[in-house]
């Protein structure tokens, strides 16, 4: 159950990564549309046939998805989403990180001290 809880905590970061990758992909695909295609004799290798077939299969899916999500790519919508994401997840990241580091340090010191032989470390109460 804790594994599922950890994955749910990572979901906002994963969504942000997917969103950024989608933005990059959309920008690159627009840049590739402007560049001319390579001459036909360079397309004769087996791997270029595979990549050509994959592009042929995936291009309609990518275009449909881009068309459906066009409203989201507008600057105001994207800026609003990023501001909301920052407010919800990243604004207090510094204090949360400091608290986590202190808690982890204390926990690690306690575990280390409990593993240390009494002759070397002494009693906990002696400090």
From Swiss-Prot:
Signal peptide: 1-27
Main subcellular location: secreted
Source species, domain of life: Eukaryota
Protein keywords: Glycoprotein, Lipid transport, Secreted, Signal, Transport
Keyword Secreted found: yes
UniProt subcellular location: Secreted
Record's keyword annotation contains Glycoprotein: yes
GO terms classed as biological process: lipid transport; positive regulation of triglyceride storage; triglyceride homeostasis
Annotated glycan sites: 63
Record GO cellular component, one term: high-density lipoprotein particle
Family classification: Belongs to the apolipoprotein C4 family.
Purpose of the protein: May participate in lipoprotein metabolism.
Record's protein name: Apolipoprotein C-IV
Annotated gene: APOC4
């Amino acid at each position: 159950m804790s594994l599922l809880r950890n994955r749910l905590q990572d979901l906002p970061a994963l969504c942000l990564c997917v969103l950024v990758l989608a933005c990059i992909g959309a920008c690159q695909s627009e840049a590739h549309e402007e560049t001319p295609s390579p001459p036909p004799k360079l397309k004769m290798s087996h791997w270029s046939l595979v990549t050509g077939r994959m592009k042929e299969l995936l291009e309609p899916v990518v275009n449909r998805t881009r068309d459906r999500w066009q409203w989201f790519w507008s600057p105001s919508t994207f800026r609003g989403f990023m501001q909301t994401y920052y407010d919800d997840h990243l604004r207090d990241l510094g204090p949360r990180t400091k608290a986590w580091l202190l808690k982890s340090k204390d926990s690690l010191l306690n575990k280390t001290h409990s593993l240390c032989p009494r002759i070397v470390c002494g009693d906990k109460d002696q400090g």
